[in-house]
Amino acid sequence: MLPHRDPATQPEGVVAGYAQTASRWPAEPLVRRPQTRTELGAPQPRRRLAPARGDLAGHGTKRAAGQLIHLRARVVDEDGAPVAGALVEVWHCNAAGKYIHPNDTNDAPADPNFYGAARLVAGDSGLVELRTIKPGAYPVPDTRVWWRPPHIHFSVWGRVWLSRLVTQMFFPGEPLNETDYILNAIRDPAARSRSLARLMPTERGPANALVYEYQLVVRGRGATPSLP
């Protein structure tokens, strides 16, 4: 069964101006099918995938380069109730705009002290916490040059395999937000604002990190926009 998808708040997977998104979206129309015991009772992802580190910034004196941030992300449903036990996967580039995976052709320098990805399990309040560095911007390898603003990728698994949200979190006040094809594929301004983290200017995180908060709404009409 396909969830409600408002085109104003949930953009299509193929984003104009970003050719790579064509390979991340079904080429054929989606098919609606009834929910069965298989869809509702499949193995829970968190039982198959163990939670990993919640620190991407390194340890001790060997810390990743860049602005240290402490991120608090809360997973909730459409009623605001916490989704305890949700499996949250996080990944982003380093401060120079370089990802750790081998397919990244950006010639920016790698950071040997930056881990690049984490896997966390939400607690009873739906909260996961992560220490990392603020990612950098990077140019998109496309027919025309444009830059991705700093952003963090999330994959949130629910209680079954077919319950998954893939999205991106952006930082407020970034000039490149205004020209980003991914963020601006969300046509509704209110929905677009739900993809922005909130800076907590009066708080100080561990090791003097900037503190950001973000809410991941996994379903419903107020769901966090799905982004590739």
Segments predicted by a language model, with ranges:
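Beta-strand-dominated extracellular/periplasmic modules and repeats
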Residues: 1-228
